[in-house]
């Protein structure tokens, strides 16, 4: 079995790059391949992101064929309510370590997803950096302390 994982990160609302990336993947992608984004898609420097609070950017990435995306610090900048709305756009948004101020997971955001490809299961985990007043760092810090990485 040959599987290609297409991966993007830190696109920072450079949508002209997304169009080129999507065209390349569409031309080369096989059914079993994965397309993952590692976050920082929704940069507030862009009017599309500002006006739609990230939903426009998420729809563009979804249209490009992404299988899942991690929540990056730029998505966290959208704050909880907008982030939950983005997750409601029928896209797998991943973060195993962010919660709201009451330490509850955010609706629509899961820590991981399993993809079955050619009889093999692939676990994809999303981990987000902490940069926002509206999200608590507790789980993030504990996660890395447990790994003796802090």
Regions found by a protein language model. Give the residues of each.
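Acidic, metal/ion-coordinating pockets
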Residues: 1-150
